Amino acid sequence: MNLKNNTDQIKRDLITGSRRLSNYWWAITIGLGSSGFILAGISSYTKINLLPFTDTTQFLFIPQGITMLLYGTIGFLLDIYLWLLILWNVGAGYNEYNKKKGTVSIFRWGFPGTNRRIEVIYPIEQIQAIKLEIKQGLNPRHSISLKIQEKNEIVITPIGYLLPISVVEEQAANLASFLNIPLDSNQ
């Protein structure tokens, strides 16, 4: 979480969405790999070598060429999906804690359509506690949640980031101190 626009009355945490370095890496890698598979499949059908670093004209179109063409097409569709996620910046947004208005606002960008803008606003009085959850093991999880009265918990840490425990603990303690709300730790 990036911190920006913080004063003694307003605290805003910016959330990075799909425009992460890892998503750019995977989009480029899958795009290059799927292009290679598609060109290999077409080369095996036309018997014209379209890949300069290997001779794929020796493959039989059925079954090797058509299989490579199928894998390349699936990879290309996945690549388009990743680039659209990056373009739309799905998951980006902010968490704003406004003591002046007495509200907590959680905003995220979603997929295009009627619900592209996802925003929930709660009065600070409805927040019972800041919950810190730390799980170790094969699927570790370090997250901060808002415990809302008569509602579910709302996770406010970005998904896909595994911050060090000390950083998550410090963020949770700072938020609890800022909102003057108890910190509930589940370790």
Swiss-Prot record:
Superkingdom of source: Eukaryota
Membrane-crossing segments per the record: 21-43, 69-91
GO CC annotation terms, alphabetical: cyanelle thylakoid membrane; photosystem I
Main location class: plastid
UniProt keyword annotations, A-Z: Cyanelle, Membrane, Photosynthesis, Plastid, Thylakoid, Transmembrane, Transmembrane helix
Protein's GO biological process: photosynthesis
Subcellular location per the Swiss-Prot or TrEMBL entry: Plastid, Cyanelle thylakoid membrane
Topology within the bilayer: Multi-pass membrane protein
Claim: Transmembrane helix is one of the keywords in the record: yes
InterPro entries: PSI_Ycf4_assembly
Record family assignment: Belongs to the Ycf4 family.
Entry function: Seems to be required for the assembly of the photosystem I complex.
NCBIfam families, A to Z: PRK02542.1
Protein name (Swiss-Prot/TrEMBL): Photosystem I assembly protein Ycf4
Source organism (scientific name): Cyanophora paradoxa
High-level lineage: Eukaryota, Glaucocystophyceae, Cyanophoraceae, Cyanophora
